Amino acid sequence: QVYANPIAYSTDQHGRTYVNSKSGFLISVQPSRSTSRGSVNIQSPNVKVSPLINANSLNTKDDQLMAIKAGRMIQQIANTKAIKSVTKKAFDVNFMNLDDEGLLNSFREFASTVYHPCCTCRMGRSINNSVINNKLQIHGLKNIRVVDASSFPNITSGNINAPTMMLAYRAAEIILEDNF
């Protein structure tokens, strides 16, 4: 998924992203079918202690090749007459002259999740490879269900808003069937 934002972002010394006060835009790519898998682990019985989250981005060769291909595509778009006519200079990193390794390093440094996490409580048949069953119940428990994008067994090819609404609609039907 390629998108352009009419705003520019920068990253501070602590790795936090902020909106740059200067006029700018962003051309970006969001791979829709990542093959890398991360993890979310509980590190304490204390609910106030955050879980350990490892996105594990760009861990597979397929994802690395996709990032390089995406970087090359962004370079081609940025090199068009139309984009060049409205561009003075790059804010943080000039992607135009990066080789494959440079593109990967840049993606590792600046990439983010775009706030659409899913598949962390995966639906499946077995407790060995999933958290919930096909009725959205946590394996081994009857009255607790997971009804959000975390229950998807696989990430969708695009934004997850509509599939999440469809899941919620189906979950309501399942809950009514089970209780009436």
Predicted regions, residues:
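FAD-dependent oxidoreductase catalytic-site/capping-region signature
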Residues: 1-163, 171-180
